[in-house]
Amino acid sequence: MAEYTLPDLDWDYAALEPHISGQINEIHHTKHHATYVKGVNDALAKLEEARANEDHAAIFLNEKNLAFHLGGHVNHSIWWKNLSPDGGDKPTGELAAAIDDAFGSFDKFRAQFSAAANGLQGSGWAVLGYDTVGSRLLTFQLYDQQANVPLGIIPLLQVDMWEHAFYLQYKNVKADYVKAFWNVVNWADVQKRYAAATSKAQGLIFG
């Protein structure tokens, strides 16, 4: 069975300073993200064993663990690509037009996305996603690593609101962290994800 691996980053840990510290990025990548990768591989191995033993209770437990850790791995893999030392400013082209159509303007989108991030209770993510059924952009709060996400949604932009993503630098002032995040958003990556999402067929099939 193929195992999941920790991806390399496109930039050095300190490249996002002063907006996100190198210390945070190094710990975030080598400790937290690495833990999710180990967790998903461990869950897969235990799930395979549970299925071989027809242990249904263990199957359900490890499917739950798999969803959590795989969610963490996927979310962080998108997170690193969503960031760039050359980021910031605003999107252009088709993505900019889609944001204007869905939210009224970029400023209104930014305010709504920031409110989703700052208002999240506990741990999770704020997400800009593409609804493949309704062919529209949506923002929503993702709880923990995998909860509250409708099927058929493709994530385009995410901000990590777990405390490990900001507390060493911003303490409990989440709003300052979210404000700093906008300075390093890699809109080229978000645009690429949008183009890929909109090129797909309808996400769910209705009989």
UniProtKB/Swiss-Prot annotation:
The keyword Amino-acid biosynthesis is annotated on this UniProt entry: no
Lyase found in the keyword field: no
Coiled coil regions, renumbered to chain: none
InterPro entries: Fe/Mn_Superoxide_Dismutase (IPR050265), Mn/Fe_SOD (IPR001189), Mn/Fe_SOD_BS (IPR019833), Mn/Fe_SOD_C (IPR019832), Mn/Fe_SOD_N (IPR019831), Mn/Fe_SOD_N_sf (IPR036324), SOD_C_sf (IPR036314)
EC number: 1.15.1.1
Function: Destroys superoxide anion radicals which are normally produced within the cells and which are toxic to biological systems.
One term under GO cellular component: extracellular region
Known cofactor(s): Mn(2+)
Keywords: Manganese, Metal-binding, Oxidoreductase, Secreted
Reaction it catalyzes: 2 superoxide + 2 H(+) = H2O2 + O2
Molecular function (Gene Ontology), one example: metal ion binding
SUPFAM superfamilies, alphabetized: Fe,Mn superoxide dismutase (SOD), C-terminal domain (SSF54719), Fe,Mn superoxide dismutase (SOD), N-terminal domain (SSF46609)
The name this protein goes by in its record: Superoxide dismutase [Mn]
Family stated for the protein in its record: Belongs to the iron/manganese superoxide dismutase family.
Localization terms from the record: Secreted
Origin: domain of life: Bacteria
Cofactor comment: Binds 1 Mn(2+) ion per subunit.
Binding site for Mn(2+): 28, 76, 160, 164
Enzyme class: oxidoreductase
Chain ranges passing through the membrane: none
